[in-house]
Amino acid sequence: MEHFRNIGIIGRLGSTQVVDTIRRLKRFLLDRHLHVILDEGIAELLPGHGLQVSSRKQLGEVCDMVVVVGGDGSMLGAARALARYKVPVLGINRGSLGFLTDIRPDELETRVAEVLDGQYTVESRFLLETQVRRKLEPIGQGDALNDVVLHPGKSTRMIEFELYIDGQFVCSQKSDGLIVSTPTGSTAYALSAGGPIMHPKLDAIVIVPMYPHTLSSRPIVVAGNSELKIVVSPKMDIYPQVSCDGQNHFTCSPGDIVTISKKPQRLQLIHPLDHNYYEVCRTKLGWGSRLGGGS
């Protein structure tokens, strides 16, 4: 008996390798007599596929599982669209790093079969939601699985802002920006800026200054339920941006307020049974092996 009957497929656009992998996946799923639904974006690259085509909203509503073929960027986009529907998501890596996409293309059939047969675990990952307000009126909002970043945009000048956590003033800062990251995003941009690696099961948020003018400004780890408020200095004459996962962007004006908090809905991420977070870090980040040559 199949654990999943209606399988959605999302793929990264502009890659022939992704298209080839999706064709393999489609054949494999159809051979198991499953109902396969293609995301409308990737369907155009598969002429004559003969399958149902749906929007991501519809995939979330009708699918038992969605398979994302691509890299971490593809998974980030899918996560933001699908988290609200609680549909579990499985990743096949066709990118460079693959922190979120576990399955290698060469093991596609074997690994997907294991998942279909019930040999998998589901890990819950929380997202952040952010809103930009101008004179109390919302002008932009978005979600992020990795991080919300305040940055100068096209300017090379520093940003001035104030940070509040749960209504309490923390600091005023002059820097290149601020990264607010989930545990999932702690191995991404936040890591490059000197932030700590956080296990994805942690209920915490890390706040990482980007090249702060004050050297004592260090990363801060706060409770996952914290509510953050960033007040962009009204004295500035530049217009910084807020980016969600580096994919969605909003332009701020001096005096704007950026709020960031945990999103109620979570991503349900499927892993093979032998998934090992520390092995992923060791492989992707180039950590050393055990003494004596062991892995």
UniProtKB/Swiss-Prot annotation:
Binding residue positions for NAD(+): D72, G73, N146, D147, R157, K174, D176, T187, A188, Y189, A190, L191, S192, Q247
Cofactor(s) the record lists: a divalent metal cation
Assigned EC number: 2.7.1.23
Reaction catalysed by this enzyme: NAD(+) + ATP = ADP + NADP(+) + H(+)
GO cellular component: cytoplasm
NCBIfam families per the UniProt record, alphabetical: PRK01231.1
Role this protein plays: Involved in the regulation of the intracellular balance of NAD and NADP, and is a key enzyme in the biosynthesis of NADP. Catalyzes specifically the phosphorylation on 2'-hydroxyl of the adenosine moiety of NAD to yield NADP.
Sequence similarity: Belongs to the NAD kinase family.
Listed name of the protein: NAD kinase
Organism: Azotobacter vinelandii (strain DJ / ATCC BAA-1303)
Encoding gene (name): nadK
